[in-house]
Amino acid sequence: MPQQLSPINIETKKAISNARLKPLDIHYNESKPTTIQNTGKLVRINFKGGYISGGFLPNEYVLSSLHIYWGKEDDYGSNHLIDVYKYSGEINLVHWNKKKYSSYEEAKKHDDGLIIISIFLQVSDHKNVYFQKIVNQLDSIRSANTSAPFDSVFYLDNLLPSTLDYFTYLGTTINHSADAAWIIFPTPINIHSDQLSKFRTLLSSSNHDGKPHYITENYRNPYKLNDDTQVYYSGEIIRAATTSPARDNYFMRWLSDLRETCFSYYQKYIEGNKTFAIIAIVFVFILTAILFLMSRRYSREKQN
């Protein structure tokens, strides 16, 4: 079977509970950002120090870099989806097996070489003071293919979500250059719209017409699951952690289930009946928009 391409849509109903998935031991207290880059496609922060262990990991995996993804609008921008729900953005933390391999370049040649942690970003009404430390560095890398020292004290632990239960599956890096095991925290961290919009002002490496282009979006759409791909989760409370406000009443749950059905039809027919697949994905987008607007209204009512 071919390797499962990343990203994917995680269907919580089909995820398999695995009691052997112990909590991760995250040791970012000694991690220090060294440089921040505008690659022309994304924002990358390189790190020195920091590692993860525990969980299902055979040994320590050291932190290499952080990548950030976003979309044109605040309501979509994540690579991975949870029950067809897209978050505002996504952070990927790339780690490599230092105990077994001599370098990152060597590690990525092997199926046990890379571990990527995914953290979702969700736009809210309040600024994230820890995420702001990254935003403050963006003016120094506004042009494509530029790099600058990360000149602020930054503690990566502060960007971890409040709940560290996780999904995991075997896939690839986002650019499909290497195999990778994914650890996905379904509980997002909150940021402000103004913070996310700053990323859309970065210049892209695309310059085919001689005019400046901006990285208005860089997320990837999900790939269909292979028949043998298994998604596992680490605990029962994960289902509660992935529940969005759009599922807090019967009608919204019904809309969400209908959206999932349409998305499954899209995945089923994309290789055959493309017309039917297009109709299905259009319904997915429409239902997603309705759920988003109803979710926003629910949040405002709850605050009031």
UniProtKB/Swiss-Prot annotation:
Keywords: Disulfide bond, Host-virus interaction, Membrane, Transmembrane, Transmembrane helix, Viral attachment to host cell, Viral envelope protein, Virion, Virus entry into host cell
Source organism superkingdom: Viruses
Protein location: Virion membrane
Record flagged with keyword Disulfide bond: yes
Gene3D superfamilies with a match to the protein in the record: Alpha carbonic anhydrase (3.10.200.10)
PTM annotation: Apparently non-glycosylated.
Biological process terms in GO annotation: symbiont entry into host cell; virion attachment to host cell
Subunit-level organization: Homodimer; disulfide-linked.
Membership in a protein family: Belongs to the alpha-carbonic anhydrase family.
UniProt name for this protein: Cell surface-binding protein OPG105
Species of provenance: Rabbitpox virus (strain Utrecht)
